[in-house]
């Protein structure tokens, strides 16, 4: 049976509001909570709370639900040791609950701290190297090495956990899917009826197994037009070049997204609705592609808490056949 996680957006809401959403999500019956990990939003003005301290607060404010990053990037912001250390810290405080989503990142979050944004091939190679470092640190190894992207000198984790993280790796193409197969317990992607089947086939052919995680934006409001206007700013996150190339200025990214994507295209790629039945139908379409987890990213603006309550009252019971 598919599990349904709430995705909370550090780019859109202040951290205290997201904490309310996390508590409401557990009460509504969501199966987990996924937090974005951004230095900057995709537009201005936006938000940019730090996901790692927020996750500690979310773990303390909730009782049982799994929680983690969706996703953390392997770039200039974080040496892999910091990611490995942060995850172990959460696991020691909330055993059995944290997961870790990993991706190759965006220039949006790396260039402002001094990264020279690499080619797509090097983005993936850097993620591969970072995952190798984290894997060995979680095993208790001490590392001294000069890699292509990271340096380690007598590096080890002095606090370890019994459990390794459920590691879900973001992939949109065959090279990243191979990395996900090599290191991950699942593949995280944005569902697309045309490209997702071949992506999953390539991942499995490379030895990948485990969870298939789909992430989807949703915006609910009492009026469908309001739901669209509320989520419109997320067009800045849609163009593929914003991930592949050096786009790092939020205002320009939003303007470019608005130019590149019509409202009709956006409504096909995101779940934008006032009718809970339409939301259920759209999620059912995603399920036809075979996910085990769907992360429903709540971009409902001023109606965010109402949307979570609606999911608990109508959407999740319908999806589960209650």
Language model: regions and residue ranges:
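Active-site-adjacent structural elements that line small-molecule/cofactor binding pockets in enzymes
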Residues: 1-322
